[in-house]
Design a protein with these regions (language model features):
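Multi-pass membrane catalytic core of lipid/isoprenoid biosynthesis enzymes
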Residues: 1-51
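Membrane-interfacial segments
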Residues: 18, 22-23, 54, 58, ...
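Generic hydrophobic alpha-helical membrane-segment signal
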Residues: 27, 34-40, 53, 92, ...
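N-terminal signal-anchor transmembrane alpha-helix
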Residues: 37-39, 59, 72
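Short, functionally important structural connectors and interaction interfaces within domains
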Residues: 42-45, 55-58, 100-106
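Contiguous mid-protein beta-loop-alpha structural module that forms a pocket-lining wall or clamp
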Residues: 49-55, 62
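C-terminal membrane-associated helical module and adjoining short loops/tails
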Residues: 61-170
């Protein structure tokens, strides 16, 4: 339950708050009172993921579906630390709603995702992990140099996106 509150309800509440205050296209104004509640799909699917995969023994060297902490980090980084893109365009609401559906699906789908678990430290057999770690360090360093500490927090949504896309093509 604590994991669902931390990694499901908390990001859902963040997304709810953003959907509540953001601009809507005029034809969606009548849905303004109800659309923010779509954010709680994140909490429901996070709970479902935790129930489905918590005792799954197939995840010893990789993950199946996006882990809830990664999903929470994605949403926190995207919404809390990158709010300016959400206020520029009224169509941003569509991006948020689409991302709610996509990320919720990725939580529970049977997609294998590499884990940063090492059985041995040699490069051979761990190439993807080491390249991903190098990518993460470079992105975070560039973000810190360009934006300072806030850049560190802003960059995580991109890192999570690359993590999922990399796993898709392995």
């Amino acid at each position: 339950l604590a994991d669902d509150v931390t990694f499901g309800v908390a990001p859902a509440t963040i997304v709810f708050s953003q959907l509540y205050v953001m601009e809507y296209p005029s034809f969606l104004e009548s849905l303004r009172p109800v659309l923010p509640y779509a954010a709680f799909i994140i909490a429901a699917f996070s709970a479902l993921r935790l129930a489905k995969f918590n005792l799954d023994e197939r995840q010893s060297t990789s993950f199946i579906g996006v882990p809830t902490p990664a999903n929470a980090l994605f949403w926190g980084s995207l919404i809390v630390f990158n709010p300016e893109w959400l206020t520029v365009h009224s169509w941003s609401v569509f991006i948020i709603l689409a991302l709610i559906l996509i990320t919720s699906y990725l939580l529970v789908c049977e997609l294998p995702l590499f884990a940063l678990k090492f059985k041995q430290w040699s490069f051979k057999g761990n190439e993807v992990k080491y390249v991903f770690i190098a990518f993460t360090v470079i992105v975070l360093a560039l973000a810190i140099v360009s934006e300072g500490a806030i850049g560190f927090l802003q960059a995580w949504w991109l890192i999570i996106l690359v993590y999922v896309l990399t796993s898709l093509f392995l």
